[in-house]
């Protein structure tokens, strides 16, 4: 096996483990439960031999499912899966002590348990592959009682989910949202460690949303979620595709594999296929996805023939933009959003097409769309300084290019502070350096989330890409992210733009085996306030 293949295999295992995942957080209050024997029959799991196994299986009722022993509630089935450093079966004792009534594991897990479990143990050769459907059964197939909208793509998922949720709420719908920034149920926020939660957590969340009166859920669907079965057991009313560019090649062996993971939400032969597809066709991948899907509703903000199009795009004095959305009937709708950038016109068009599909007209959605701001997405930090200061989540080449292109203007200077994540696709680093040096006047290369990699080596790769440009940009290396932000702020003159890119809404910096509190928005605000005090 090549080093690249070994790295991808290791990353898949690490992602599957999710040792950093947050607690479950949201569960239904009332679950009827399912007999363990029926669940075993459903997924084709065998009963492992051991004390008290066969006699009690028929009498066991499962009322919850979890992957984490510390999240077990009485009545749960504990799914003990393979991890990057340990097998979940090692935590079976803790799970049982917390009330687990059964265990689902693989043959390696059975060997680890070695007949020591005082509850029935179901064994399956690939338990992760059946976990989503099993959890959906335990929680009463909640997605069948909701309108579930799944949004996938490299960039724009978070913004589009926020736009859709805003449109739903403006139309009087009770909406749920699941994504990178967190989970929202009827306006109440919960944190999230994953773009798309693990299958048992997702099904529990959906069931809890049903209990709370939610009628429509909009969620981000990552390629990891599709490849690892996190959305198995979920019925999607609408699947939407935003775009595709280089990302996650530490997990996917190729861009083709990355595309195919996304395509499982649209392919007519896929068990995950959404009933209706909405596809932005402004890149090659979008056009290929529209061809793959059956009767896709197409969207274009780039003057391509599509069901939904944008015309008369113009910036507003408040820093947003307005445009006319042309619907499939050829009717124009005046739309205003507080988000800059042509890519956000595309995101808004995707949202409008989704909303129309689920019965919300543009006119109903407009009051919500025009007020929405997305945390950490071109989020403006204003402390009275004479220049524009922004924080954005752009952490991949095309996202960085899009944001810098939006902000660049011949009459003002542009500074960008960014790094690259460790233990992630290293092939993104040099291209990001090149893009920054091509489009910005000041490039400050700093640390992002180095994780377990040497941060100096990461910065070196970015700097090598920037050096290839050989232009007029000033390129500096400042390892400490706080100092890097302060440097860019001190450099800025009235009318300039300072962008802090890569971490967006995140509130911690991962490196050296720990997470330290760090929020780009807080640090940028502090730097601006210090600047004003000195003035």
Curated annotation (Swiss-Prot):
<feature type="binding site">
    <location>
        <position position="222"/>
    </location>
    <ligand>
        <name>UDP-N-acetyl-alpha-D-muramoyl-L-alanyl-D-glutamate</name>
    </ligand>
</feature>
<dbReference type="InterPro" id="IPR013221">
    <property type="entry name" value="Mur_ligase_cen"/>
</dbReference>
<dbReference type="GO" id="GO:0000287">
    <property type="term" value="F:magnesium ion binding"/>
</dbReference>
<dbReference type="InterPro" id="IPR036565">
    <property type="entry name" value="Mur-like_cat_sf"/>
</dbReference>
<feature type="binding site">
    <location>
        <position position="424"/>
    </location>
    <ligand>
        <name>meso-2,6-diaminopimelate</name>
    </ligand>
</feature>
<feature type="binding site">
    <location>
        <position position="230"/>
    </location>
    <ligand>
        <name>UDP-N-acetyl-alpha-D-muramoyl-L-alanyl-D-glutamate</name>
    </ligand>
</feature>
<feature type="binding site">
    <location>
        <position position="506"/>
    </location>
    <ligand>
        <name>meso-2,6-diaminopimelate</name>
    </ligand>
</feature>
<dbReference type="GO" id="GO:0051301">
    <property type="term" value="P:cell division"/>
</dbReference>
<keyword id="KW-0436">Ligase</keyword>
<keyword id="KW-0547">Nucleotide-binding</keyword>
<feature type="binding site">
    <location>
        <begin position="448"/>
        <end position="451"/>
    </location>
    <ligand>
        <name>meso-2,6-diaminopimelate</name>
    </ligand>
</feature>
<dbReference type="InterPro" id="IPR005761">
    <property type="entry name" value="UDP-N-AcMur-Glu-dNH2Pim_ligase"/>
</dbReference>
<keyword id="KW-0133">Cell shape</keyword>
<feature type="short sequence motif" description="Meso-diaminopimelate recognition motif">
    <location>
        <begin position="448"/>
        <end position="451"/>
    </location>
</feature>
<protein>
    <recommendedName>
        <fullName>UDP-N-acetylmuramoyl-L-alanyl-D-glutamate--2,6-diaminopimelate ligase</fullName>
        <ecNumber>6.3.2.13</ecNumber>
    </recommendedName>
</protein>
<dbReference type="Pfam" id="PF02875">
    <property type="entry name" value="Mur_ligase_C"/>
</dbReference>
<dbReference type="GO" id="GO:0005829">
    <property type="term" value="C:cytosol"/>
</dbReference>
<dbReference type="GO" id="GO:0008360">
    <property type="term" value="P:regulation of cell shape"/>
</dbReference>
<feature type="binding site">
    <location>
        <position position="502"/>
    </location>
    <ligand>
        <name>meso-2,6-diaminopimelate</name>
    </ligand>
</feature>
<keyword id="KW-0961">Cell wall biogenesis/degradation</keyword>
<feature type="binding site">
    <location>
        <begin position="153"/>
        <end position="159"/>
    </location>
    <ligand>
        <name>ATP</name>
    </ligand>
</feature>
<dbReference type="Pfam" id="PF08245">
    <property type="entry name" value="Mur_ligase_M"/>
</dbReference>
<keyword id="KW-0460">Magnesium</keyword>
<dbReference type="InterPro" id="IPR000713">
    <property type="entry name" value="Mur_ligase_N"/>
</dbReference>
<feature type="modified residue" description="N6-carboxylysine">
    <location>
        <position position="262"/>
    </location>
</feature>
<keyword id="KW-0573">Peptidoglycan synthesis</keyword>
<dbReference type="InterPro" id="IPR004101">
    <property type="entry name" value="Mur_ligase_C"/>
</dbReference>
<feature type="binding site">
    <location>
        <position position="67"/>
    </location>
    <ligand>
        <name>UDP-N-acetyl-alpha-D-muramoyl-L-alanyl-D-glutamate</name>
    </ligand>
</feature>
<keyword id="KW-0132">Cell division</keyword>
<comment type="similarity">
    <text>Belongs to the MurCDEF family. MurE subfamily.</text>
</comment>
<keyword id="KW-0963">Cytoplasm</keyword>
<keyword id="KW-0131">Cell cycle</keyword>
<dbReference type="GO" id="GO:0071555">
    <property type="term" value="P:cell wall organization"/>
</dbReference>
<dbReference type="GO" id="GO:0008765">
    <property type="term" value="F:UDP-N-acetylmuramoylalanyl-D-glutamate-2,6-diaminopimelate ligase activity"/>
</dbReference>
<dbReference type="GO" id="GO:0009252">
    <property type="term" value="P:peptidoglycan biosynthetic process"/>
</dbReference>
<feature type="binding site">
    <location>
        <begin position="195"/>
        <end position="196"/>
    </location>
    <ligand>
        <name>UDP-N-acetyl-alpha-D-muramoyl-L-alanyl-D-glutamate</name>
    </ligand>
</feature>
<dbReference type="GO" id="GO:0005524">
    <property type="term" value="F:ATP binding"/>
</dbReference>
<dbReference type="InterPro" id="IPR035911">
    <property type="entry name" value="MurE/MurF_N"/>
</dbReference>
<comment type="pathway">
    <text>Cell wall biogenesis; peptidoglycan biosynthesis.</text>
</comment>
<keyword id="KW-0067">ATP-binding</keyword>
<comment type="function">
    <text>Catalyzes the addition of meso-diaminopimelic acid to the nucleotide precursor UDP-N-acetylmuramoyl-L-alanyl-D-glutamate (UMAG) in the biosynthesis of bacterial cell-wall peptidoglycan.</text>
</comment>
<dbReference type="InterPro" id="IPR036615">
    <property type="entry name" value="Mur_ligase_C_dom_sf"/>
</dbReference>
């Amino acid at each position: 096996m090549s080093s690249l293949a070994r790295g991808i295999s290791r990353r898949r295992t690490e992602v599957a483990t999710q040792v950093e995942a947050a607690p479950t957080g949201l569960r239904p209050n009332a679950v009827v439960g399912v007999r363990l024997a029926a669940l075993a029959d459903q997924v084709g799991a065998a009963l492992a031999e051991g004390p008290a196994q066969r006699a009690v299986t028929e009498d066991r009722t499962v009322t919850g499912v979890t992957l984490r022993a510390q999240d077990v509630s009485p009545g749960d089935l504990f799914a003990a899966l393979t991890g990057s450093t340990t097998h979940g079966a090692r935590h079976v004792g803790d799970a049982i002590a917390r009330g687990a009534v059964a265990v689902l594991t693989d043959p390696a897990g059975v060997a680890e348990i070695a007949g020591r479990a005082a509850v029935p143990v179901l064994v399956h050769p690939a338990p992760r592959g059946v976990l989503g459907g099993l959890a959906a059964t335990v929680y009463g197939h909640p997605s069948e009682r909701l309108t579930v909208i799944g949004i996938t793509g490299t960039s724009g998922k978070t913004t589009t989910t926020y736009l859709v949720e805003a449109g739903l709420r403006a139309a009087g719908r009770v909406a749920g949202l699941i994504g990178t920034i967190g989970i929202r149920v009827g306006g109440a926020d919960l944190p999230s460690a994953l773009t798309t939660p693990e299958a048992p957590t997702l099904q529990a969340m959906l069931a809890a949303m049903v209990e709370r009166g939610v009628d429509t859920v909009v969620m981000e669907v990552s390629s990891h979620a599709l490849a690892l079965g996190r959305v198995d057991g979920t019925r999607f009313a609408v699947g939407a595709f935003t775009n595709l560019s280089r990302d996650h090649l530490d997990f996917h062996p190729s861009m083709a594999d990355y595309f195919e993971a996304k395509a499982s939400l649209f392919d007519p032969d896929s068990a995950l296929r959404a009933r209706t597809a909405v596809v932005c066709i402004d890149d090659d991948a979008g056009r290929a996805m529209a061809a793959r899907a059956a009767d896709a509703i197409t969207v274009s903000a780039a003057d391509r023939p599509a069901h939904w199009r944008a015309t008369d795009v113009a910036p507003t004095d408040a820093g947003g933009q307005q445009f006319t959305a042309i619907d499939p009937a050829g009717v124009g709708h005046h739309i205003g959003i507080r988000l800059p950038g042509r890519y956000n016109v595309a995101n808004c068009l995707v949202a409008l097409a989704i909303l129309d599909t689920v019965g919300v007209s543009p006119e109903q959605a407009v009051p919500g769309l025009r007020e929405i701001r997305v945390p950490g997405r071109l989020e403006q930090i204003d402390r009275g300084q004479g220049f524009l200061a922004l924080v954005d989540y752009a952490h991949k080449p095309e996202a960085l290019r899009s944001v810098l292109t939006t902000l660049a203007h011949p009459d003002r200077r542009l500074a960008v502070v960014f790094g690259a994540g460790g233990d992630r696709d290293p092939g993104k680093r040099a291209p990001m350096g090149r893009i920054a040096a091509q489009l910005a006047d000041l490039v400050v290369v700093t640390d992002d989330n180095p994780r377990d990699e040497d941060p100096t080596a990461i910065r070196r790769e970015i700097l090598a890409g920037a050096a290839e440009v050989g232009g007029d940009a000033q390129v500096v290396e400042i390892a400490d992210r706080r100092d890097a932000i302060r440097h860019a702020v001190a450099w800025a003159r009235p009318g300039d733009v300072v962008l802090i890119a890569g971490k967006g809404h995140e509130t911690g910096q991962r490196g050296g085996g720990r997470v330290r509190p760090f929020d780009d928005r807080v640090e940028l605000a502090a730097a601006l306030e210090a600047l004003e005090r000195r003035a």
